[in-house]
From Swiss-Prot:
GO terms for molecular function: asparaginyl-tRNA synthase (glutamine-hydrolyzing) activity; ATP binding; glutaminyl-tRNA synthase (glutamine-hydrolyzing) activity. InterPro entries: Asn/Gln-tRNA_amidoTrfase_suB/E, Asn/Gln-tRNA_Trfase_suB/E_cat, Asn/Gln_amidotransferase, Asn/Gln_tRNA_amidoTrase-B-like, GatB, GatB_C_1, GatB_Yqey_C_2, Gln-tRNA_amidoTrfase_suB_CS. It holds the Pfam family GatB_N. This is Aspartyl/glutamyl-tRNA(Asn/Gln) amidotransferase subunit B. It is an enzyme of class 6 (ligase). The lineage of its organism: Bacteria, Bacillati, Bacillota, Bacilli, Lactobacillales. GO terms for biological process: glutaminyl-tRNAGln biosynthesis via transamidation; translation. SMART domains: GatB_Yqey (SM00845).
Amino acid sequence: MNFETIIGLEVHVELNTNSKIFSPSSAHFGEDPNANTNVIDWSFPGVLPVMNKGVIDAGIKAALALNMDIHKEMHFDRKNYFYPDNPKAYQISQFDEPIGYNGWIEIKLEDGSTKKIRIERAHLEEDAGKNTHGTDGYSYVDLNRQGVPLIEIVSEADMRSPEEAYAYLTALKEIIQYTGISDVKMEEGSMRVDANISLRPYGQEQFGTKTELKNLNSFSNVRKGLEFEVERQAKLLRSGGAIRQETRRYDEANKGTILMRVKEGAADYRYFPEPDLPLYEIDDAWIDEMRAQLPQFPAQRRAKYEEELGLSAYDASQLTATKALSDFFETAVSLGGDAKQVSNWLQGEVAQFLNAEGKTIEEIALTPENLVEMIAIIADGTISSKMAKKVFVHLAKNGGSARAYVEKAGLVQISDPAVLVPIIHQVFADNEAAVADFKSGKRNADKAFTGFLMKATKGQANPQVAQQLLAQELQKLRD
């Protein structure tokens, strides 16, 4: 029997506001344990939450970017559960009226086809703290993360393979990152993924019993965990077994999933409206204000790069991998840079430099202005392509004018025959054995002179001009 795979994803995205959702504590990552906390985060008696408007702004932007309807009257709810990293014993979240609902995004698969994935809802909530279980037998609670604003994006169960789930996450991350509401760094916990997967016989309408997957700390592990579950569940069903509703975690070392707990039924969180927060009205003016702040998204930029700038689909995809890179490219082209040349540099030397340095394009000194200037002085023959690599490294580390650096460092390419011909004659005088080999007709003897000339000019001879002049002067030797 063959089975159809059914996948839905729940993605938690931390919003990059300066302060937390209901308290003035800093929401920044990486501080000492409990440094970013106050009496609200610790749930002291009598304290009340105060809404951070920037969180609603971010929620509206996310909803618009994901083609969602927006609840014009929005409220928060209490989700009741006890855990040490949740001192209130409830989480402030949204239940029946999330900020966004009924959305969709389009994904692109490896074969080039596209598919629309529906999004059920996106709701705002506060993050919980973090428990650390020490080797000394004690557990430690860090509430820095408590109250950091989240938006949870819940897809419909529209994905039919691990490949589609991977493509959905890739597209979702791109879109969220372009809005500017989150840096979506999985390694820092600002993007977290839970997956729900079930199998059903082809032709059956009813979903099978789902398994929830956690501990998915990369898109690659999401894919691997889902692939493992497809095989595990199919094997179990074919042998006459039944799938239990359970939560499993992906174990990277064993390349498989491990049981965490069995779910006897749906959890009862006893949701009820949060009495300490008002109803929030989101009018059209507010929505329009947030819409005006949104950029052009990756899909639209890729289409523009292919149709208007003549780039390949691959180049367009690489250039839109991050908003910062895409913005850099667009600025460079607007300054007169050739689109293909700028693209080649960004995907070649620039990408290699960033990987080697472990930095992003915003963190180096290179600017669109000095990259375009460098490309221009390659085109006009001021420097060679080989010399340009040295110039680029200087610009990436120090910035400044490409032309000014080339002139100051004495890197200007020598193209004047009046300068090169005397140097060629000196090369002949300094290499009599090579001249003798050439005159005697020794095979490939002429090629040695190119290296001699480049050495004599410290690599500054224009290769094309040098080859032409060498051929002329060598012919004179032969005559």
